[in-house]
Design a protein with these regions (language model features):
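N-terminal cap/lid segment of alpha/beta-hydrolase-fold proteins
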Residues: 28-58
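Short, surface-exposed "cap/lid" segments of acyl-processing enzymes
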Residues: 57-88
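Conserved alpha/beta-hydrolase
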Residues: 88-104
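Alpha/beta-hydrolase active-site loop
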Residues: 107-127
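Gly/Ala-rich beta-loop-alpha elbow adjacent to hydrolase catalytic centers
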Residues: 136-140, 144
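The feature captures the conserved acid-bearing segment of alpha/beta-hydrolase catalytic domains
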Residues: 162-224
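C-terminal catalytic histidine-bearing segment of alpha/beta-hydrolase fold enzymes
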Residues: 217-282
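Central antiparallel beta-sheet cores of small beta-barrel/beta-sandwich binding domains
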Residues: 288-368, 374-382
Length: 393
């Protein structure tokens, strides 16, 4: 490992890291279960999506190793893998999350995380995975770029809003750090997401400078910049990003050969296949949807079937399902923001209402193809979306 980051540190640091922090990897543990507690570990691995099947090294396109962000003493490791990676899992990739204990974050976290990421790269290669993709958000995106800068054998990198502020929350982003990596990094292909209005990084516009650098290099790259319709520091981890660019990213990674220039996304006229992959239960699960409209109160019968929409950056999906008790109404509700399920609902005044476990309220109205209103538990805000009709195919 001869990257510039690794050359700046004495080898003794690596030895200390091994002694101080327990290591759990695919080579010595089969426990990759989701929502683990860190215990006394600094690093541990989890599957990205425990409700989806693992492909394994023999059948998978490859493995995606995800690094999450950093936020002081907050439990950043609790953040789920982004929806766009769920789409990749559906399309033949195994997604693994490399998690870090927030209580052990130090000024040396970057170095240790890059080292551990590269160790996992070697482990998954030895396990037989044909391709290795590194991915990350914010600090995790920075780790991703430093890792591929330190090891030129990585097949692809996905960096979402990469960077870290100097001196913690009070500091500013130094964009030149990422730009220098872009000038020299050697990787099979690179996907870079730089959303508009990134408040965490001082609203700096980085897309034009990144394009100027990458366009001069012999490198296949996908750049989603400030002109893309994606906004906010976490824009790349939203349902909106998965909906608009997930299929494009999957194609970018799957193509056997790519020209050494910017990859252009072709927007699809039918977003439903992506919504279906993101939010419908696995095919083995019975949806048990209401198929006879007379099973619903007359005023809401137009709402029969699957419907979906966008609440700001979150994709939501709803459908009436068969209730075990006659006269009862139940709704399937799923979103890219929170885990979903099937919940009791009521009809009043020609609308359907449902209370989610977090006490927020969903209201469905049979206007046109349907409208959905989400209301906060304390009534402080609400969001509306016009619904579209989905399909079971």
């Amino acid at each position: 490992m001869n990257g510039p980051l690794l050359r700046r540190h004495h080898p003794i640091l690596l030895a200390v890291a091994f002694l101080l922090f327990a290591r759990v990897s695919i080579a010595d543990s089969n426990d990759l279960g989701c929502q683990q507690e860190p215990g006394d570990r600094f690093f541990w691995l989890e599957r990205g999506f425990c409700d989806l099947p693992v492909h394994g090294p023999d059948r998978a396109n490859g493995v995606v190793i995800w690094n999450h962000g950093i936020s002081g003493t907050r439990q950043s490791w609790m953040a789920p893998a982004p929806p766009v990676l769920r789409l990749l899992q559906h399309r033949g990739w195994d997604v693994i999350m490399l998690k870090r204990h927030h209580s052990a974050e130090t000024e040396n976290t970057l170095y240790r995380t890059v080292q551990r990421t590269l160790e996992e790269v070697a482990t998954f290669k030895k396990a037989g995975y044909r391709k290795i993709v590194l991915a990350g958000q914010s600090f995790g995106g920075y780790v991703t770029l430093e890792a591929v800068d330190s090891s030129p054998t990585i097949d692809a990198a996905i960096a979402l809003s990469p960077g870290v502020r100097a001196q913690g929350a009070t500091g500013r982003l130094d964009p030149s750090i990422i730009e220098r990596i872009l000038q020299r990094v050697t990787v099979g292909r690179l996907a870079l997401v730089l959303p508009k209005d990134d408040a965490l990084f001082g609203y700096q516009e980085r897309g034009a400078r990144a394009e100027a650098i990458l366009s001069r290099r012999s490198l296949p790259y996908l750049l989603v910049d400030e002109t893309s319709g994606i906004s906010g520091h976490g824009g790349g981890v939203t349902g909106r990003f998965a909906l608009q660019y997930g299929a494009c990213l999957a194609e970018f990674l799957a193509n056997t050969t790519l020209p050494t220039r910017r990859f252009q996304c072709q927007q699809t006229a039918d977003p439903w296949p992506v919504v279906r992959e993101l939010l419908l239960p696995p095919a083995s699960d019975s949806l048990n949807l209401v198929r006879d409209s007379t099973a619903l109160p007359e005023s809401v019968r137009p709402l029969i079937g699957i419907r979906w929409g966008l609440l700001e950056d979150t994709i939501v999906l709803v459908a009436p399902v068969v209730a075990e008790q006659p006269g009862k109404l139940r709704l399937m509700y799923r979103s890219t923001g929170i885990s979903g399920g099937v919940f009791d609902a009521t009809t009043t005044g020609g609308v359907i209402r449902m209370v989610l476990p977090n006490k927020s309220t969903i209201t469905l109205k049979p206007d046109r193809d349907g409208t959905l209103t989400w209301s906060a538990a304390d009534g402080s805000r609400s969001l509306n979306t016009e619904l579209r009709i989905g399909r079971e195919d």
